[in-house]
Amino acid sequence: MEDINIHKLKTGIVDLMSVHNRSEWIYRVRQSYQARDQIKKKKRMIFINIETVYSSKREQITKAVARRLRGKQMTCPPKFMGDIRVILGPGVARKLYYSLTKYSTSHHVQQVLSTQAVVLERYWLHHAAFTISKFYNETDLPPRGHHMYRWPRDLLAPDVLFFVNATKNVGLATGFDQPYTAFTERLIQVFRRVDGVKVVELSPSKNYLVVVKNIISYIREQFRDHPDINLPGLDLPGGVLQKDITKR
């Protein structure tokens, strides 16, 4: 758990890569990735991360936002790395694989941002939230400010992370069929405590387009005049956000 916010090309990851060094995805990552704190500041497109408590409708939201921004929809792990997961059993190898996927995704995003906005479904916080929530219970969850919630220094952070929350009245409010449990509550608390990235919390809705509307409204209001970010024309009417849970 001490390494959850330190994503590096550790010896174990390099060893994992060498075992599969003939695989196309390993070659691409090993030859092209160089860890950087962030993209050098210059005029570019926006990088957005979409996270949800429940997976239902997350892909629809991501796809719709990418379409509105005339950008690229992406997911983590990248599709070209998906096949390797099925041959890795539980244990260290799989943990190293998931760390490696974050770097591959980061590199791919950096390549695209010069020409297109990127809307990414799942990223570091998705994995971290589930890991922390499984490891701790309600009484010993690390407090806000703990290093586990800190975005990794060497992993590209999104310009804004939209977190679609859950509600205890899941079926009535959102149409989701997953139960609201103590684990769900821990997930929400982890999402709210993350540090080092702008997190905006959104209310769920049966109609996912309501969530999309709120996302586009926030982007237009907060990034239209940003000195470092280009945005395509946005003409969708504004929406009402639940709350902005970070003040950074």
Identify the function of each model-found stretch.
Residues 49-65:
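Glycine-rich phosphate-binding P-loop
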Residues 1-42, 61-64, 169-248:
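NTP-dependent small-molecule kinase module
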Residues 64-72, 162:
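Amphipathic alpha-helical segments
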Residues 48, 74, 119, 160-163, ...:
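Hydrophobic/aromatic beta-strand patches that form the interior of the parallel beta-sheet core
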Residues 127-190:
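A glycine- and Lys/Arg-enriched "phosphate-lid" helix/loop adjacent to the NTP-binding pocket
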Residues 51-53, 123-124, 129, 165-167, ...:
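Anionic group-transfer/hydrolysis microenvironments
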Residues 70-142:
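ATP-dependent small-molecule kinase phosphotransfer cores
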